[in-house]
Amino acid sequence: MSNNKLLTDEQKELYSLMLPIYGAMVKQNNTAKILNTSIATLYRMRKQGIGASYKKLESNSKNGTVVYPLQEIVRYITESNVKTA
């Protein structure tokens, strides 16, 4: 896991629910669905240095393949929540 941060109990529960559906590494199209956004928005977020952490895998394409570790998506979803009273 990135930054050696452990998942909270809430994050572990969400991760365990999503893992059988999406796998440990999530492609951009599924990440966009999970975050209810577009692939273009994910691209802009990466360029701005915001959003979930991602990995760029080497491939035959000139730009490589971008994937998102599921634990980073879970962390992003839960840590970007605003707590209300």
Language model segments and positions:
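A detector for short, charged/polar N-terminal pre-domain segments
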Residues: 1-23
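Short alpha-helical interface patches
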Residues: 18-19, 33, 78
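Major-groove DNA-recognition helix of helix-turn-helix-type DNA-binding domains
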Residues: 25-28, 33-67
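Intrinsically disordered, low-complexity segments enriched in glycine/proline and serine/threonine
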Residues: 13, 49-50, 75, 82
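Generic detector of low-complexity/intrinsically disordered segments
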Residues: 8-9, 37, 44, 72
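A short, Lys/Arg-enriched interface patch at domain edges and termini
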Residues: 2-3, 70-85
